[in-house]
Amino acid sequence: MKIAFITPVTPYKENMGGPSGHPYHLLVERPQGIEVEIYSYNANKLSLETIEGVERELRVKIHVLKQPVSFTWILRLHLTFIRFFLKYPIGYYIRLPKCTVEQIKASSPNAIWGYGQEFSGILKQFKEYKRVHTVPDCYSLHWFRRLGCRFTLTSVRDFFRCVVNYRKYYRMERDYDTSDNITAHLVGEEDARFLKEINPSINAVFLRHPHYEIPKKIKSTKFSSPKIKLLVAGRYDLYMKEKADEMVKLLANKDNMGRLQCVYMLTFLGKGWEQHVEKLNALGYEVDHIKFTPDYIKEVCRHDIQLAPITVGTGTKGKVLDALANGLLVIGTPFALENIVVENAVSCVEYHSNEELLAVLRDIPDKVEVYEQMAEKGREAIFVEHGRRHISQQLMDLFK
C-alpha cells in the first residue's frame, strides 16, 4: 500500500517548532509493505540535513512545499487581522496548487493522509481517494474549555479571542467531510465525542497517542537518594499557570517546607519559570531551571517523578506520556492524565486538590518501594497500550 501524507510540519522524533513528534512516531514502526511519501510545508523549518536524516529513519521520501503566496504577503504586510473576517480559521483556506495535486495523483497512492485540523480543505482536493484526517485534537473543545476557565481570560481581548476562535473552529469541524471514504482520527476520547456531537454524521475514531523516544537500555526504576528528583516539564503558560502557582504556594508554606526540603530537589524544564525558581531557591529548596535541552528524553530520565499541574487542555499530553514511558512516576491532574492508560494509585497518582498533592508528597519518602513499583507499572502500561507498533497498525488499518 502507498500513502501520500500531507502535513504542515515535517515529522521529527521530538516536537520541534510544532507538533512534529506525533506523525514521526506513527510512522517509525509502521507495518512492512507500506510506502509513504510526505508532502510537507515544513512550517517547523527543519534543515535540509535534518530532513534527509528523517527520510532515512522513517524510510520515506519528503517533498518540501512552498508556503502559499497569499499567506506570504499576509505575513509580510502584517495583515493577519484578515482572519477576523473569515468564516473558518485561516489555515483552512490553504489549498495545494494544481501541479502538486497532479504530482501526488501521478505517484499512484492508494490513500491520502492529512495532518492537522485546518487541512480538511486540502483533503477535499482528493475526494476520490480513501482518506484519513489526523486532526488530532478537537479544537472547538479546546476553546470551549478555555471559556470555562476564567483564570485563562485575563482581559476582554482574551475573552473575545476565545469566543471568535470557538465559533470559527466549531463551524469548520461541523463542516468536516462526512463521506464514506474519509475517517477523522483523534488522540482524545472526549475530543472524539465532542466532534461527533458537533458533526453527528462524521466517522471519527479515537486512537491512543504513541509514546515517543525511550532509551535503548531500560533501567529498573529506583528513586534517587538522599533526595528524590522532581521534574516539572513544559512552559509556564496559561495551561499550567493556576495549578502550578498553587503547587509552588504549597511548597512555600512554612508548615511544609521543613519536611519537603529535606527529601526533594526540583527541576523546572521549560521557559517562564524564573519567578518560581527564584522564590523556592530563596526559601532553601534545591531548585534547577533548564530553559532548553538538546536531548529532552535524556534530561527527563535524570529524574524520578514528574509533577504535571495541568489546568486545561485537550487530547493527550505528550510530556506526560514521555515521563511514563521512561519510568518516571507521574503525579498529575485529571487533565494531565486524560487519554492515557494508567490507573490512579496503581500506575500513576492523580490529584484533585492541593491537600491530595501534599499528602502524596509526604507519603512517598516513607513508602519509596511502593511508588517505585507504581512507576514501573506505569511504564509497562504505556508499552502495551501506547506502543508505537501497535498504534501504527491501528492507524494503517483505517486506510484499508
Regions picked out by a protein language model, each given a short descriptive name:
Residues 1-61, 252-258:
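N-terminal subdomain of nucleotide-sugar transferases
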Residues 22, 209-279, 291-296, 301:
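Conserved catalytic-core segment of nucleotide-activated headgroup transferases in glycan assembly
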Residues 25, 98-105, 139, 151-184:
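Membrane-proximal helix-turn-helix segments that form the acceptor-binding/catalytic region
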Residues 121-123, 164-203, 275-278, 395:
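A short, active-site helix/loop in glycosyltransferases that binds the activated sugar's phosphate group
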Residues 301-315, 326-328:
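Acidic donor-binding loop of glycosyltransferase active sites
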Residues 319-322, 329-333:
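Short hydrophobic beta-strand element within catalytic cores of glycosyltransferases
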Residues 346-355, 363-368:
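Conserved acidic donor-binding segment of nucleotide-sugar-dependent glycosyltransferases
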Residues 366-399:
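A charged, aromatic-enriched C-terminal amphipathic alpha-helix characteristic of glycosyltransferases
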